């Protein structure tokens, strides 16, 4: 069950005494955030707005929406990171899943006893990582937890940042991800080029995602070579507050033009196939907003992420593209 740190929210409201607040969180916990907004309204007697647009992480907080509503505080729930206060009026609130891992850890011990593994997870299960590491160690599995960097805690990964995994990849036999997210685990597999497994407490299984990740990379590579045939490109800047990478976009524009390509600069809040269908005479796109937009969605035309775009430039220069996803981060 998902447990939201409601105490922190009510403590902040009691201390700061805002006239109104806004709350948001990932889609999976939005009903709980909805209930919490109602609870704040009833208990504190202030408007509590539920920002129901998707929020994918600290790069996508929708603080603009909170500002439009004149909400004095925004509580972003479920995107744990090192920064408790993201900006002066944005509070990052923990939302943890308390499901036990005991049974699936037993299966993990049988499979990995005598091996060295990197233990990783996302926000929901970060509070369990030390306990699970100790249990594995006590049963003959050598466990390493990589150091966090920037917003990342030790052992924590985002969908686009993998520092705790990449820094120890040469010291381990495999990666073990706590949770259910193929999204995060496949990213770990690609960033480290190591066998990667999910410890899923809900299905009580140890599930390998290495082949799934390889298929992702094959599709991504195919899109790179398709894009190489395009004469006209659209380079897309994301308009969400943490995705505004104008300098990267301008760099790609110049380098594509140096290769003889025509480039349109485009700005979008939500980069979807439907929006891109409205644009004419563009053979391929590069988007510098979020790498997972490219790897996890289907588009009619190539829509390359930053790592793919860097590889595209190598293709255009007749160079080897290499393991382009094997990076600390994909931004």
Would you name each region that the model predicts?
Residues 46-85:
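Eukaryotic helix-linker segments that join adjacent hydrophobic helices
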Residues 132, 183-263, 270-279:
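Redox- and metal-dependent alpha/beta enzyme cores, enriched for Fe-S-associated oxidoreductases
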Residues 23-28, 53, 78-79, 95, ...:
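Structural motif
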Residues 8-19, 108-117, 224-233:
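Glycine-rich phosphate/diphosphate-binding loops that line cofactor/substrate pockets in enzymes
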Residues 24-47, 120-147, 238-265:
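Short, charged N-terminal beta->alpha structural module
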Residues 1-16, 20-30:
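N-terminal basic/disordered segments at the start of proteins
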Residues 85-213:
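Conserved, well-structured core segments that form the ligand-binding/active-site neighborhood
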Residues 202-206, 211-214, 291-331:
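Peripheral docking tails and interdomain loops at the edges
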